[in-house]
Amino acid sequence: MEIILLLFLLQIKHCYADFVIQTYKQTVHKGIYRDPIGISHSVDHVWTSMIALLVFSFFYAINPFTIIWLCFAEGILHYHIDFVKVKFGSKDQTKPIFWAQFGLDQLAHQVTYLVMAIFLLNL
């Protein structure tokens, strides 16, 4: 049951960071490596992951340092997944390849959350 709660919290935070608070500028600048505006989107994922894991830690003990480094690792990975998609992916939303690449991007993020959950539940 723990994994369901953890994945649920990570899904909520992902939806919020990717689809609610992400700005147009962030979507464009994610394709410029080390651009502060593009990086800010990944920072949004770091702090929303921290909140999700802090909520989870009310029910299941997690070392605070583990939360910090795991969230920063997720932010770095999120940044690079998005960079590759924006830099090398299709920009034309009318083409099926755009949506296939968008789906692969989202799958990569979901696999990241699954790995995070498996790691945390096997400490």
Residue ranges with predicted function:
Residues 1-90, 94-95, 99-123:
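Hydrophobic alpha-helical transmembrane segments
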